[in-house]
Amino acid sequence: MKKVFRLVAVVAATVMAATAFVAPATAATKVKVGLAYDIGGRGDKSFNDSAAAGLDLAKKNLKVTAREVTVTTGSDSEREDKLRLLAKAGYNPIIAVGFLYAGPIKKVAADYPNVSFGIIDDSSVDLLNVAGLVFAEEQGSYLAGVAAALATKSGKVGYIGGVRIPLLQKFEAGFVAGVKATKKSATVDAKYV
């Protein structure tokens, strides 16, 4: 639960930081945040839900308006279409959830230089109007590893990652480091599904 709360807090801070790119809102100009989810969208019980929770906090606390879009096929062209839809509709900033948006956001941001974009889990886009929103994921999973090491009676713990990608390998590395720092003799069985 603490990990989820931390991620929600990070996403809320991300949305708040992204709105700092935009001129202060007045009664006549209200900040319109666009949020582009990856496959699964709101309700995925994962990264998209964390972004949604942050957006909900921004809507409540900052009084921003927002539009949410979700890709269904996962193609770069669909991601690009979703970003263009938000940019054409005047949303600024636009935040994309996940590194798979890197190529599409680079194209769209180049066409909309006066719109601020943010991309979660990627810092490869080198444009002035794109903020790479990357986090030290391994630090949170380190703490989870410490907790697992303290909880195990057998000296064995497991780590399950969804897909073997660099991001989840960072989670695994942090988790294993936390386990080993707490209980050197413990073994970690890591699997990806």
Describe every region a protein language model picked out.
Residues 90-98, 118-120:
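Periplasmic-binding protein-like
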Residues 76-90:
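Short, well-structured alpha-helical segments in soluble
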Residues 1-11:
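Bacterial N-terminal signal peptides that target proteins for export
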Residues 62-71, 183-193:
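Short beta-strand elements in bilobed, periplasmic/extracellular small-molecule ligand-binding domains
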Residues 33-61, 67-80, 98-101, 164-170:
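Extracytoplasmic "Venus flytrap"
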Residues 8, 17-25:
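C-terminal segment of classical bacterial N-terminal signal peptides
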Residues 110-134:
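Flexible loop/hinge segments that line or gate small-molecule binding clefts
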Residues 55, 142-190:
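An alpha-beta-alpha
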